[in-house]
Swiss-Prot record:
Protein name: Pseudouridine-5'-phosphate glycosidase
Any one GO biological process: nucleobase catabolic process
Alphabetically ordered keywords of this record: Glycosidase, Hydrolase, Lyase, Manganese, Metal-binding
The protein's assembly and partners: Homotrimer.
InterPro entries per UniProt: Indigdn_synthA-like (IPR022830), PsuG (IPR007342)
Encoding gene, per UniProt annotation: psuG
EC number: 4.2.1.70
Length: 308
């Protein structure tokens, strides 16, 4: 397995010395945002993690290798190359074996992070059960990954375009703890509210770090969700975004958009219908998640190092 992994010097040094590391995905760069906002966001997020005492490890697949940490030129490649594949668990081996370039989703980033020994990951929002999922069976592989891979994910909830109620039901079935970070309500990506509660509320990085260590010390496989609402000043109104999503969903149906095309299509439509406000919110919530993830990574690593 190790023959597939390559590390930047910064990440290698951190892992060898038991320093806190935060994994980052590349799908948000290649498929989630337009250029140049995507590359600007990627670099800013990495710096936010450094400023909060941890080391960023942006993950992607290139030239038959799983890159744990990317150089500036590699980041640029993910931001501008139109042939970047979107990689989840099922595509992982194929993209790696064929030498193609692949951006990692939440699921694929978790797989690579665990291989590298990284247990903290910051993203925008997780995938989940799509609306009308009971008819289409369109359920993101992110959810099954969270059930089996030991990586905690800081996110602003599930993407608003999903069926949040069913997503939470599925996570409960899979035994994935959903922690509200300083919130009692599960956030819905662009909005702070969703109408659904979290399993438990935790207000400090230290308590989250302790829970992570305890979970894995017990041999309880799988990750956990740390739901961190978008800052109030950047949030969109829950009812307004819901109306926009209903409109975008109708268009997706008319155009027979399905499978892994749904999320990029919907995010693009929502961006147009909100006149770009959703993109600004998306960038703000990713930065906020990176800050919280770095603080928790520091607390988790301190706790883990004491137990060694």
């Amino acid at each position: 397995m190790k023959q597939y992994l390559t590390f930047t010097e910064e990440v290698r040094h951190a892992l060898e010395n038991n320093l806190p590391v935060v994994a980052l995905e590349t799908t948000i760069i290649s498929h989630g945002m337009p250029y140049p906002q995507n590359i600007e966001m990627a670099k800013e997020v990495e710096q936010i993690i450094r400023d909060n005492g941890a080391v960023p490890a942006t993950i992607g697949i290139m030239d038959g290798k799983i890159k744990i940490g990317l150089t500036d030129s590699e980041l640029e490649e993910f931001a501008t190359n139109k042939n970047v594949a979107k990689v989840s668990r099922r595509d992982f081996a194929y993209i790696l074996a064929s030498g193609k370039i692949g951006a990692t989703t939440v699921a694929a980033t978790m797989i690579a992070a665990e291989m590298a020994g990284i247990h903290m990951f910051a993203t925008g929002g997780i995938g989940g059960v799509h609306r009308e999922g009971e008819i289409t069976w369109d359920v993101s592989a992110d959810l099954t990954e969270l059930a089996q891979t030991d990586v905690a994910v800081v996110c602003a909830g599930a993407k608003s375009i999903l069926d949040i109620g069913r997503t939470l039901e599925y996570l409960e079935t899979q035994g994935v703890p959903v922690v509200g970070y300083r919130t009692d309500e599960f956030p819905s990506f662009f909005a702070r509210k969703s109408g659904f509660g979290v399993d438990m509320r935790i207000d400090t990085p230290e308590e989250v770090g302790k829970m992570m260590n305890t979970k894995w010390d017990l041999g309880l496989k799988g990750g956990m969700i740390i739901a961190n609402p978008v800052p109030e000043s950047d949030a969109l109104n829950h009812e307004e975004i819901e109306a926009v999503i209903q409109k975008a969903l109708a268009e997706a149906k008319e155009n027979n958009i399905a499978g892994k095309q749904v999320t990029p299509f919907m995010l693009d439509k929502v961006k147009k219908l909100t006149e770009g406000k959703s993109l600004a919110t998306n960038i703000a919530l990713v930065k906020h998640n990176a800050e919280v993830a770095a603080k928790i990574a520091v607390a988790y690593q301190k706790e883990a190092n004491q137990g060694k």
